[in-house]
């Protein structure tokens, strides 16, 4: 099983999403459900890091990025021999040039 490392930007993305859903949309149960599915997805990634599709872009990227949907969001991560880095957690309809 790979060690999971959360980059600060990914942690911020997750907190922003949960806060928006819980407080702006006044849907705390939906926020809890999203967090539960996020946690389950990360556990699956730790066990099977290559199971999800590669993120394709025309721009050159230093690391190979993979993506997996989590409800209306997309989790982006990179796999290394000793760890998986959770890079971003973005709303599914958001533009991707900021990866």
Predicted features and spans:
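Arg/Lys-rich, positively charged N-terminal/basic patches that mediate binding to nucleic acids
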Residues: 1-37
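Secondary-structure transition/hinge residues
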Residues: 22-25, 46, 50-53, 94
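Enriched for short, Lys/Arg-rich terminal
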Residues: 25, 63-66, 70-99
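A short, surface-exposed loop/turn module that caps and links secondary-structure elements
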Residues: 43-69
């Amino acid at each position: 099983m790979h060690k999971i490392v959360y980059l600060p930007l990914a942690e911020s993305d997750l907190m922003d999403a949960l806060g928006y859903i819980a407080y702006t949309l006044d849907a705390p149960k939906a926020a809890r459900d999203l967090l539960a599915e996020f946690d389950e997805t990360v556990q699956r990634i730790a066990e099977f890091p290559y199971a999800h599709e590669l993120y394709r872009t025309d721009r050159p990227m230093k690391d190979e990025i993979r993506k997996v949907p989590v409800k209306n969001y997309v989790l982006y991560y990179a796999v290394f021999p000793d760890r998986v880095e959770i890079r971003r957690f973005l709303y599914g309809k958001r533009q991707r040039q900021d990866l």
